[in-house]
Amino acid sequence: MMTNLNIKLHHGLVNSTPKQRAAAQTLGLNKIGKTVTREDTPALRGQLQVLRHLITVEEAD
């Protein structure tokens, strides 16, 4: 069974690149402070790498 990750957007997307905005939209992160839970996959890890300076990631219980 794969683990789940809690992902929280803690910085805005105003000065971000189109690639970063697209990754945030795909994850469902559209407002500062929004938290989503996603299954940990290699594709998700790639999106998180693009947004690494804008988000915090924790393992969900």
From Swiss-Prot:
GO terms for biological process: translation. Keywords: Ribonucleoprotein, Ribosomal protein. Pfam families: Ribosomal_L30 (PF00327). Transmembrane segments: none annotated. GO terms for cellular component: large ribosomal subunit. One of its GO terms (molecular function) is structural constituent of ribosome. It comes from the Bacteria. InterPro entries: Ribo_uL30_ferredoxin-like_sf (IPR036919), Ribosomal_uL30_bac-type (IPR005996), Ribosomal_uL30_ferredoxin-like (IPR016082). NCBIfam families: rpmD_bact. Belongs to the universal ribosomal protein uL30 family. Part of the 50S ribosomal subunit. This is Large ribosomal subunit protein uL30.
